[in-house]
């Protein structure tokens, strides 16, 4: 006789975390938005590929807006109402991602630019020939 099927999936525990940190990593090819609590534990994340954008469409401001909305909705399900925003990188989706957080209904308390800037670090690669 066959054993009855047991459900091995974890149930998501609904947390009530009022404040969070939105990490926006924007490169020239992609944008990744991660929303964590104040300790750094990830609550929700999203990227252009996870939503369904492919190729050069991943680097557009529209894609960044959709990514930010998806990550914010996941965090709001866990009770996040206000976020501090940390933006890293020079990509085209920086501003659109921050704007989308306010459109969804999250309160943005501060915006911090964490883009790493070298103090004349390593030697750059040779220039591509034309």
Swiss-Prot record:
GO cellular component: ribonucleoprotein complex; ribosome
Pfam families: Ribosomal_S11 (PF00411)
Superkingdom assignment: Bacteria
InterPro entries in UniProt: Ribosomal_uS11 (IPR001971), Ribosomal_uS11_bac-type (IPR019981), Ribosomal_uS11_CS (IPR018102), Ribosomal_uS11_sf (IPR036967)
Alphabetized UniProt keyword annotations: Ribonucleoprotein, Ribosomal protein, RNA-binding, rRNA-binding
A GO BP annotation: translation
Oligomeric form and interacting partners: Part of the 30S ribosomal subunit. Interacts with proteins S7 and S18. Binds to IF-3.
Function: Located on the platform of the 30S subunit, it bridges several disparate RNA helices of the 16S rRNA. Forms part of the Shine-Dalgarno cleft in the 70S ribosome.
Similarity section: Belongs to the universal ribosomal protein uS11 family.
Protein name: Small ribosomal subunit protein uS11
Origin species: Mesoplasma florum (strain ATCC 33453 / NBRC 100688 / NCTC 11704 / L1)
High-level lineage: Bacteria, Bacillati, Mycoplasmatota, Mollicutes, Entomoplasmatales
């Amino acid at each position: 006789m066959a054993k009855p099927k047991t459900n091995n999936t974890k149930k998501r525990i609904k947390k009530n975390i009022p404040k969070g940190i939105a990490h926006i990593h924007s490169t020239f090819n992609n944008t990744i938005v991660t929303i964590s609590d104040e300790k750094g534990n990830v609550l929700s994340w999203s990227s252009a590929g996870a939503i369904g954008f492919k190729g050069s469409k991943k680097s557009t401001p529209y894609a960044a807006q959709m990514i930010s909305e998806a990550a914010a909705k996941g965090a709001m399900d866990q009770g996040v109402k206000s976020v501090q925003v940390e933006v890293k990188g020079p990509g085209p989706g920086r501003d659109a991602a921050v704007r989308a957080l306010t459109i969804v209904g999250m309160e943005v308390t501060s915006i911090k630019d964490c883009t790493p800037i070298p103090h004349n670090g390593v030697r750059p690669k040779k220039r591509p020939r034309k």
